[in-house]
Amino acid sequence: MKLKNRVIIFLSSFLIFTSLLICSAGAVIGIQEEINQFPGFSGVLIKDLNTQEVLFSHNEDKLFTPASLTKIFTLLAALETLGKEYTYPTSFYFSSTAPGEVNGNLYVAGSGDPTQSLEVIRKIADTLVQKCNIKHISGDIVLDNSKFLPEEFLGRGWMWDDKNPLIGALTVMGYEVKEKQNSYLKTMPLLWGNFFSQELSKKGLKIDGSIRIGKTQEGLKVKYIYYSDTLDKILAYMMKKSDNQTAENIFRTLVPEDNPDGVSTIARAIASLEEVIDTTLSLKWGKDYILVDGCGLSEYNLMTPAHLIKAISYLYQKYDFKILDYFASTKESGTLRERLPFQVWGKTGTLSSASAMAGLLQTKNKRWVVFCLMENNFISIEDENDPKIFENRIIEYIYENL
């Protein structure tokens, strides 16, 4: 009887193993057929999340324009450099000799907080008036935008005629460039200042001067500091909504605060990112990959599917399944909502001739896999050659067969 049971167990295990092999073989054949039919240049890497076994690979070490998959590297670098509890301060300086009076200018020093929507600016104005009991400003509202270089309001390699986010130490969340302007350098901080002054005026506060850009006067003590939400929440928003303004401001914030002149330049942000990626992933900037922004709008960016898998796997090893909280999901809001009929967590990327998707899913066979799909050099048309349809079909093969 014992022998009979052993035989049954052996045969059952053999049949299960054989069926898994057949399913895996079917997935490989199906994925390869999709790749053969796709009219552009594609790269695919699929691994078992826990064992790191390669389940399928194609051009996994070739360089691609990653589009918004760049944000995965921004996520990793921000967590490693700044930490989940980091907050952006916006500081207010002025001198006062009488209750309710600001003698001279009110200075507002930004740090690149990407979360300041109109509602947040209203909240800041409310708190400032109540906390400091301000009724009158005899001078100007001076906007200190010096944390970032004014000439770096756009990223390197961005298409100048696209709708790009404006980057600055003082930014209004959700505002993008609608058309070509020669006043880019001052647009964003002045936009912030106009909304802020309007909210102050609504509360009966009188402003004698104007709104202008300048540096905070030395010797003044800070009177009030507004702190943003924690970086943990900001990163989740950046990833799920694929928000370019948020990603680029975070990228510029990677620069250590103790740098010589306190300015977060693009070159310094690249150097900070380079150091983190070298330390965590052992990848060399300029040799293995190139990234010059944090959002993925740059056509200069280059990385491979293997790089993205390495980054996601590192995040999983360090944060376990908590990393799923950062990714968009087919069952929740975000760029993947309802894209597929089963649960997938991931990051999408789209430019005019680049599409990509990377993430994690649990297959029907209860196997956790990490995947990266990248496509370049195609003519984007909404038919059977649409790269998003190509990606969906491959992910369906993964879910059904691996």
Outline where the language-model segments fall.
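Bacterial N-terminal signal peptides
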Residues: 11-20
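Beta-lactamase-like hydrolase cores
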Residues: 21-63, 85, 125-135
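Solvent-exposed loop/turn segments at secondary-structure junctions
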Residues: 50-51, 62-65, 98-99, 112-116, ...
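Active-site SXXK
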Residues: 52, 66-84, 141, 195-200, ...
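Small-residue-rich helix-loop
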Residues: 55-57, 255-402
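Short, well-structured active-site flanking segments
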Residues: 80-95, 103, 204-212, 320-324
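Active-site-adjacent, His/Asp/Glu-enriched structural segments that form or flank metal-binding
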Residues: 88-150, 157-162, 172-173
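A small/polar active-site loop signature that marks catalytic segments
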Residues: 176-322
